[in-house]
Design a protein with these regions (language model features):
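Preference for the N-terminal adenyl/adenosyl cofactor-binding alpha/beta module
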Residues: 2-16, 130-371, 401, 405-414, ...
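Signature of N6-adenine DNA methyltransferases within the class I
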Residues: 22, 56-62, 79, 83, ...
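A short, conserved, highly charged catalytic patch centered on acidic carboxylates
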Residues: 1-105, 121-122, 144-147
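Flexible phosphate/Mg2+-sensing switch loops adjacent to catalytic phosphate-binding sites
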Residues: 47-50, 204-208, 331-350, 372-400, ...
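Short amphipathic alpha-helical segments
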Residues: 6, 26-34, 186, 291, ...
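Short, mixed-charge aromatic SLiMs
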Residues: 56-61, 209-225, 340-350, 390-395, ...
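Structured loop/turn residues at beta-strand edges in well-structured enzyme cores
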Residues: 69, 101, 347, 352, ...
């Protein structure tokens, strides 16, 4: 578990005092670095080795002073030696390292001076031993506080997707398939994130695979079975003589590890793939990428059939900002100088509830929750300027405010786990600000993700309409001519009394079902849809029904733009976003695009019609007769 930043700073001060007079490179350098890692509550033995042999350029061989594979390379010199030369020496080791071993940071020191090179950000930092306590935040990657930077097409996200897909394929080839395989991969995703984001001790899971399983992989399946059982067992109920490598794992709960799974069979190749997954830095992967991870292991035919279009965070924000986020920030600006009103606003945030009735692997719910927690932190910064004894008591927003329905079991499992992981990342963000480590373990609350067909179950069974605040998502993009037999039956049921309902695209079923659900409430809805619902024949069928029988009013709309994603074989489609409710509002917003790939230009209008332009709620219906004699 991660130490608080206050504790880390205190340890850094004590470290500096203890080592302020040391000068000899070899005599005490190893003790120096053991103590350095202890500043962050990390055992150096667990993550890094001294004098790591490596082949240099040509036929020469060398030894790295301290090496944490895939993360950190340290070169240590006697006090006063040339540190720039030491940096060159460190870089010269790179050709002898495997790709997965290449470090993200180089750290050079002579006891007195520290030089840290962040190779991914291309940034350098220099400070003295006495200034270390002021710069401990630079070593968040050691403590487990690494921040996630959202980068479209981030290579590490693509690498993670490829590796998980590769592991999926080799397991499936052995006959390990279906529910067991899917649930196993979801558990593995949690374990990978957990050890890189301070839910577990650093490298706890990786070390378990490296040191407690045979190189031929023959015992990995049984070791996983033991591990899953331990993760699902409270400390006071565990065996007294439990192996130390297992006893170190925390109690997770949340039912994630409760179900008994068949034991998978591994070999040496599969073990290597598993370890390659472990060597990635999962702290740099947003849980929102789980959609991409899921899509990357589906075949093309299956993906098209499900209409599984996963998308970028930037596009998701196009929906959630006008739906609720912009309004919440406007209210925050109005009340932030009045602590009483701000506290009431904070309490209100914890009562908001969100439903994605076609949630897939949770992308929309994840980003919505993340943005809610970021706003909560801004509130907490103002309300709690003094030290806080227990930050868990001031964090009121939680994952159980978020609800989803998903027809695919694997995707629903991923969504559930991803919500826990984004919650943990947000807790780390708050921990960093208040200098106090906070983790929600064992898991007591969870997002309410239901594995079911959204068009076949009453949404009231998921969450009562008098409790819900917002509905959001991107229901499947499947045209009316591409529906399978079951989907056609669903459409016939939903549009039973709607004339010509058979020509409507699949997504329109969510519009009608949402319109029925929100009657007599203040619930606001926003869906991403193919632009066919705002042009041509479908407008006269769908919107006539919604306007006439359910009193629907469009509150905001994004006109046609290109909706693409970052997943393998990404699916690009022309879409619109429509925000609506069963009540009217002023200052409606239209987001216009000069072309489908340009940025949006916003304008405020009095009314938005179903063609998503300013105008009255008039629809053009299909006619079989001419308007006048000719």
């Amino acid at each position: 578990m991660a130490l608080s930043w206050n504790e880390i700073k205190n340890r850094a001060i004590n470290f500096s005092k203890e080592w302020e007079t040391e000068q000899r490179e070899h005599a005490e350098s190893q003790s120096f670095w053991n103590d350095f890692f202890n500043i962050f509550g990390i055992s150096r033995k667990r993550v890094a080795s001294f004098e790591e042999p490596v082949k240099k350029l040509g036929e020469k061989r060398g030894r790295i002073d301290l090496f944490w594979k895939g993360t950190l390379l340290v070169e240590h010199k006697s006090r006063g030696k040339d540190l720039d030369k030491a940096y060159t020496q460190a870089v010269n080791y790179f050709p002898g390292l495997k790709e997965a071993e290449l470090p993200k940071y180089i750290l050079i020191s002579d006891f007195e001076i520290f030089k840290l090179y962040d190779l991914e950000e291309d940034k350098n930092y220099e400070f003295t031993l006495n200034e270390l306590y002021k710069n401990v935040h630079l070593f968040g990657f050691i403590a487990g506080y690494t921040k996630h930077k959202v980068v479209a097409e981030d290579p590490i996200n693509i690498k993670a997707a490829q590796l998980m897909g590769k592991l999926h394929d080799v397991l499936k080839e052995t006959g390990y398939d279906g529910h067991a395989l899917e649930h196993f991969l979801v558990r593995l995703l949690f374990l990978e994130f957990a050890e890189d984001t301070a839910i577990f001790e650093r490298r706890l899971f990786t070390e378990f695979i490296e040191n407690r399983t045979h190189e031929d992989g023959s015992d990995i399946g049984s070791r996983f079975t033991e591990l899953f059982q331990v993760l699902n067992t409270p400390f006071d109920k565990r065996l007294k003589n439990l192996d130390e490598s297992l006893a170190s794992f925390p109690y997770v709960n949340g039912k994630l590890f409760a179900e008994f799974l068949p034991i998978p069979s591994f070999d040496s190749k599969m073990r290597d793939i598993l370890l390659e997954c472990c060597y990635l830095d999962w702290s740099k992967i947003s849980p929102a990428i789980f959609g991409s991870l899921f899509q990357s292991i589906m075949d093309k035919a299956h993906r098209r059939n499900l209409g599984a279009h996963y998308t970028s965070e930037a596009n998701i924000l196009k929906l959630i900002r006008p739906l609720f986020l912009d309004e919440l920030y406007e209210r925050f600006e109005k009340v932030k100088k009045n602590k009483k009103q701000l506290a009431e606003f904070h309490k209100e945030l914890s009562t908001l509830h969100f439903l994605d009735p076609a949630c897939g692997s949770g992308n929309f719910l994840i980003i919505a929750y993340r943005e809610l927690r970021i706003l909560e932190l801004e509130i907490l910064k103002i309300l709690h300027t003094e030290s806080v004894l227990d930050i868990s008591s001031i964090i009121w927003c939680d994952v159980d405010q978020f609800h989803g329905i998903e027809v695919e079991e694997f995707a629903s499992q991923i969504a559930q786990v991803a919500m826990w992981l984004i919650d943990h990342q947000m807790n780390l963000m708050i921990s960093e600000h208040f200098g106090q480590y906070f983790v929600r373990l064992p898991l007591k609350k969870s997002a309410n993700i239901i594995h079911a067909n959204s068009l076949e179950i009453p949404w009231e069974d998921v969450i009562s309409s008098d409790k819900l605040t917002y509905i959001l998502g991107n229901p499947p993009f499947i045209g009316s001519k591409l529906l399978n037999t079951n989907q056609r039956k669903e459409m016939e049921t939903i549009f039973l009394n709607v004339k010509n309902g058979k020509v409507l695209d699949y997504v329109t079923a969510w519009y009608l079902k949402a319109s029925k659900y929100i009657q007599g409430t203040n619930i606001k809805v926003a869906f991403v849809s193919t632009n066919s619902i705002s042009q041509g024949e479908q407008v006269g069928i769908l919107w006539k029904e919604l306007f006439s029988n359910y009193g629907i009013k469009i509150h905001f709309a994004h006109q046609t733009f290109n909706w693409s994603n970052e997943a393998k074989s990404n699916a690009a489609v022309h879409v619109v976003i429509v925000g609506f409710a069963s009540f009217d509002t002023t200052n409606k917003r239209i987001f216009e695009y000069e072309d489908i790939k340009s940025d949006a230009h916003e304008k405020t209008v009095k009314n938005i019609n179903p063609y998503l332009v300013e105008g009255d709620d008039i629809v053009v219906t299909k006619r079989t007769k001419t308007l006048c004699k000719v």
